[in-house]
Amino acid sequence: MTERIVLAYSGGLDTSVAIGWIGEATGAEVIAVAVDVGQGGESLETIRQRALGCGAVEAYVADARDEFANEYAMPTLKANALYQGHYPLVSAISRPVIVKHLVKAAREFGATTVAHGCTGKGNDQVRFEVGIQTLGPDLKCIAPVRDLALTRDKAIAFAEEKGLPIETTKKNPYSIDQNVWGRAVETGYLEDIWNAPTKDIYDYTATPEFPPAPDEVTISFQAGVPVAIDGVKVSPLQAIQELNRRAGAQGVGRIDVVEDRLVGIKSREIYEAPGAMALITAHKHLEDITIEREQARFKATVGQRWAELVYDGQWFSPLKRSLDAFIEDTQKYVSGDIRMVLHGGQAIVNGRRSDTSLYDFDLATYDTGDTFDQSMARGFIELWGMSSKVASGRDLRVEGK
């Protein structure tokens, strides 16, 4: 029986060429797997037909937009996950859902190997292969760009030689990855980290220097998940899409950062994540009034470690599952409404309310009706500073000898 290989297929030049390239290099039949995580562009049927036209014996396509929003974006939101304080894990959280469908397709079509289009110096090769070996430990992995010397120039030449139904061009100098949670742009002109991004780089966001009138929006949450916008019920996918539109129109969610890649190098990245950043901002402000102080402090540490694990391709790891359990427990009271103004590249919260809030007006007010017993403060301060006071006395005693 002829060996079968499933290929993570985007519909672009590199993976279209990879179908024939893999076939010629290995003698295997190739099954193309395309997963829609909200990247937009062509329909799944168009992509399926192109895969078949490029030589795939089968084409597996999946509309995973709701799955991605519910099972991958929402845990990211609950964690307030920003890798190194900036990056909302746009590409990192899409890889596990793609891996899940790659392994599913491999089982369905009897494949023994999974192929992906990643290079040998990026994070995604790790995310794909660690995920595949976790969900399908018997499956082998290959990367045509890394393992079979498939360069961009060779891809163009191969496509033209074989007459493949795909545009061959070098016009776009950037590497772009996008989904409903955001958009990532790298390489080309951006590799000189002194170069400012040019306007043509952006697609999800309008220029914030000339914004339209301020847009006030109220986001309602239930147990950490957005359930309504301005009183209209929404699914997680709809919430992200609506805020991509509204926050994007105001230039919210542009990020220019040099980050530490898993493989040991620093890389300049431009991100656009209007919906994600607006939601994370709103969610964090709701947590500020619904989560107890010590729990909130520890959750911030957990969220940072969670982001590192996911960035590093450990979505399916035992530690990540344990952190998920903690984060989920913190969300049971994170319900209520956040009002924010979207304008000029910023999402500024100006109102919050919750039936499960820990904010007590009578304790917080400085006006008549204050129920806070200020007479307790003196004793509290004495005890709170006791250890520092004792240590200082010791230092003075020892140093004075």
Curated annotation (Swiss-Prot):
A GO molecular function assigned to this protein is:
argininosuccinate synthase activity
* One GO term (biological process): L-arginine biosynthetic process
Residues in a coiled coil are none
Which InterPro entries does the entry mention?
A: Arginosuc_syn_C, Arginosuc_syn_N, Arginosuc_synth, Arginosuc_synth_CS, Arginosuc_synth_type_1_subfam, AS_cat/multimer_dom_body, Rossmann-like_a/b/a_fold
Q: Which residues bind ATP?
A: 8-16, 117
**Entry's Gene3D superfamilies?**
Argininosuccinate synthetase, chain A, domain 2 (3.90.1260.10), HUPs (3.40.50.620), Single helix bin (1.20.5.470)
Q: Which SUPFAM superfamilies match?
A: Adenine nucleotide alpha hydrolases-like, Argininosuccinate synthetase, C-terminal domain
Its EC top class is ligase
Give its E.C. classification number.
6.3.4.5
Q: Name one GO cellular component term.
A: cytoplasm
What keywords does the record list, in alphabetical order? Amino-acid biosynthesis, Arginine biosynthesis, ATP-binding, Cytoplasm, Ligase, Nucleotide-binding
What is a single Pfam family found in this protein's UniProt entry? Answer: Arginosuc_synth
Lineage top rank: taxon: Bacteria
Residue positions annotated to bind L-citrulline are 87, 123, 127, 175, 259, 271
Q: In which pathway does it act?
A: Amino-acid biosynthesis; L-arginine biosynthesis; L-arginine from L-ornithine and carbamoyl phosphate: step 2/3
The chemistry this enzyme catalyses reads: L-citrulline + L-aspartate + ATP = 2-(N(omega)-L-arginino)succinate + AMP + diphosphate + H(+)
Location(s), subcellular: Cytoplasm
| PROSITE patterns found in the cross-reference section | ARGININOSUCCIN_SYN_1 (PS00564), ARGININOSUCCIN_SYN_2 (PS00565)
Q: How does it assemble?
A: Homotetramer.
Q: Tell me the protein's name.
A: Argininosuccinate synthase
The protein's organism comes out as Pseudarthrobacter chlorophenolicus (strain ATCC 700700 / DSM 12829 / CIP 107037 / JCM 12360 / KCTC 9906 / NCIMB 13794 / A6)
Gene name as annotated: argG
